[in-house]
Amino acid sequence: MERVILHSDLNNFYASVECLYNPSLRGKPVAVSGNPEARHGIVLAKNYAAKACGVATGNPLWMAKEKCPDIVFVPPHYDLYMKYSQIAQEIYSEYTDQVEPYGLDECWMDVTGSTHLFGDGKAIADKLRERIKFELGVTASVGVSYNKIFAKLGSDMKKPDATTVI
């Protein structure tokens, strides 16, 4: 039996969590960053609205503001990110015990032994995305393949909120 590997990437995770906890940020360009008043720091994460303006992770704050004058900078809240990451891990663990986290927002899962219970890899990926959206309020892109490299490639191919089989 060919292995079935999933890679889940929670889309714009830090910025998405910030928008959940501060609804006034929704629809605005948002970047999780250092302190803009201290005039130092970089963009740690951004949402799609900021990305559409050309803001990139790693940009100095002055550059992000230059590219996107309406951008809202928010400080990181790692306790919230950890909480949401843990909930996502618990969801993943309901489908397989072979979960390999990579940072707070990504992980690989070997669901080979779970397909007889939950359906093929695409069906499992779609269920995971649906549950993450419903239970966490964020979206995920999930790649499905026979190895980790191609599964990761799949999760990177279509964003946000997509399943890609390679």
Located regions from the model:
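Gly/Gly-Pro- and Ser/Thr-rich, intrinsically disordered tail segments characteristic of DNA damage-repair
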Residues: 1-166
